[in-house]
């Protein structure tokens, strides 16, 4: 059996989600049709050098409408949104917009990397994706800054506002945050 004859390499009409393709195009991904699969995006990707993440495959699947294959793929979360792929794309495809939209769809469908959920939990608890620690406070003092930045760390009352927004948008439910335990479910 050749590579092309493998069952997993066959695109079936039933797997194509035209609504997903249209949603991507409506969100600025209409440039997707210009992609001719040159591979510049994948070759430019710093994450792709160290992981199985291949942005070119995601773009191809998005163009075809293979929503389920994209949103269930754990490598979707390996993109750092550095824009290296998009800046180098000879066809000016809005690659990062496509990745972000695909991640939103993945999250809605229950596919989200545990590390991303953990960052979301930190935002709920502290207002920051990366909470301040003792070492950072010492560094801030050493360069003449206050120990705490002028954010929710310095103004804890602002955290309540952040948490209201999180509840109003349903972000807490999206990541499975339990307000009683303060942990992810």
Curated annotation (Swiss-Prot):
Signal peptide: none
Superkingdom, taxonomy of origin: Archaea
Name the record gives this protein: H(2):CoB-CoM heterodisulfide,ferredoxin reductase subunit C
One GO process term, biological-process aspect: methanogenesis
Pathway recorded for this protein: Cofactor metabolism; coenzyme M-coenzyme B heterodisulfide reduction; coenzyme B and coenzyme M from coenzyme M-coenzyme B heterodisulfide: step 1/1
4Fe-4S ferredoxin-type domain mapped to chain residues: 25-55, 68-99
Binding site for [4Fe-4S] cluster 1: 35, 38, 41, 89
Keyword Kinase: no
Details of cofactor binding: Binds 2 [4Fe-4S] clusters per subunit.
Catalyzed reaction equations: coenzyme B + coenzyme M + 2 reduced [2Fe-2S]-[ferredoxin] + 2 H(+) = coenzyme M-coenzyme B heterodisulfide + 2 H2 + 2 oxidized [2Fe-2S]-[ferredoxin]
UniProt keyword annotation of Iron-sulfur present: yes
Pfam families: Fer4_8
InterPro entries (alphabetical): 4Fe4S_Fe-S-bd, 4Fe4S_Fe_S_CS, CoB/CoM_hetero-S_Rdtase_csu, HdrC_iron-sulfur_subunit, Helical_ferredxn
């Amino acid at each position: 059996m050749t590579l092309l004859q493998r069952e997993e390499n066959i695109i079936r009409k039933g797997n194509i989600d035209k609504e997903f393709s249209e949603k991507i195009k409506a969100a600025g991904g209409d440039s997707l049709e210009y992609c001719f699969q040159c591979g510049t995006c994948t070759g430019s990707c710093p994450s792709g050098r160290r992981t199985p993440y291949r942005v070119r495959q995601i773009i191809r699947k998005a163009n075809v409408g293979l929503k389920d294959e994209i949103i269930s793929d754990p490598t979707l979360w390996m993109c750092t949104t550095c824009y290296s792929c998009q800046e180098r794309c000879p066809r000016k495809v809005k690659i990062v917009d496509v990745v972000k939209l695909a991640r939103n769809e993945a999250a809605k469908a229950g596919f989200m990397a545990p590390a991303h959920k953990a960052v979301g939990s930190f935002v709920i608890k502290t207002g920051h994706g990366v909470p301040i620690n003792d070492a950072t406070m010492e560094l801030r003092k050493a360069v003449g800054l206050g120990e705490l930045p002028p954010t929710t760390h310095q103004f804890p009352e602002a955290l309540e506002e952040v948490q209201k927004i999180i509840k109003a948008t349903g972000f807490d439910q999206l990541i499975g945050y339990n307000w009683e335990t303060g942990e992810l479910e």
